[in-house]
Curated annotation (Swiss-Prot):
Localization per record: Cytoplasm
Protein name per its UniProtKB record: Segregation and condensation protein B
HAMAP family: ScpB (MF_01804)
Lineage of producing organism: Bacteria, Bacillati, Bacillota, Bacilli, Lactobacillales
Entry function: Participates in chromosomal partition during cell division. May act via the formation of a condensin-like complex containing Smc and ScpA that pull DNA away from mid-cell into both cell halves.
GO biological process: cell division; chromosome separation; DNA replication
GO cellular component terms listed in the entry, alphabetical order: cytoplasm
Quaternary structure note: Homodimer. Homodimerization may be required to stabilize the binding of ScpA to the Smc head domains. Component of a cohesin-like complex composed of ScpA, ScpB and the Smc homodimer, in which ScpA and ScpB bind to the head domain of Smc. The presence of the three proteins is required for the association of the complex with DNA.
Pfam family, one: SMC_ScpB
DNA repair found in the keyword field: no
Organism field: Streptococcus thermophilus (strain ATCC BAA-250 / LMG 18311)
Length: 193
């Protein structure tokens, strides 16, 4: 079984920018808060001692999160200024689609739909101005809600979200396309068989 430290790091990684409270981490890890505090101190010491990691532990308003070290601020600022004309990754496009159709939505809800962590894609989409924080969800931990921006509408060439293709329509078109792609005979001779 994984160490408490590895399990703690995994939870904080998946929590992303929302972070986790001491109480939530203690419940999930099934350890007392005193033991958790010691583990957090060990994790912070590990990050500080390792010059080959860009990560550090940040505590803010009784919430802990894994973030990049301040030394990398200039590099990340330059990255965030990268022009939007470069193509978005498949992951970013998936996240953008989910946010567009399900907004407002939390990162955890996006993760549930995709089955993987979406923190990086969300950060990139925010940096490009395609999505924004749209408040906090009234739930445990008060996670951020995300929604698309006016720039998103301009970027995809529509005037309002009402102009998005209905999901049912997309599913129907996808099924029709897959019928012709996957189930189509390799050549016309197969039609006779």
């Amino acid at each position: 079984m994984s160490s408490h430290l590895a399990r703690l790091e995994a939870l904080l990684f998946v929590a992303g920018e929302d972070g986790l409270s001491l109480r939530t981490m203690a419940q999930l890890l099934e350890i007392p808060v005193t033991g958790l505090t010691q583990s957090l101190e060990k994790l912070q010491a590990k990050y500080e001692a390792d010059e080959d990691t860009a990560l550090c532990l940040l505590e803010s308003s009784n919430t802990y999160k894994i973030v990049t070290k301040p030394d990398f601020a200039c590099l990340l600022r330059d990255y965030s200024k990268t022009p939007i004309n470069q193509s978005l990754s498949r992951a970013s496009l998936e996240v953008l689609s989910i946010v567009a159709y399900k907004q407002p939505i939390t990162r955890a809800e996006v993760d549930d739909i995709r089955g993987v962590n979406s923190s990086g894609a969300i950060a990139k989409l925010q940096a490009f101005g395609l999505i924004r924080e749209a408040g906090k969800k009234d739930a445990v931990g008060r996670p951020n809600l995300y929604a698309t921006t006016d720039y998103f509408l301009d970027y995809i060439g529509i005037n309002s979200l009402d102009e998005l293709v209905a999901i049912d329509q997309l599913e129907l078109e996808e099924q029709e396309t897959s019928l012709f792609r996957e189930d189509a005979p390799e050549d016309l001779e197969d039609l006779d068989n």
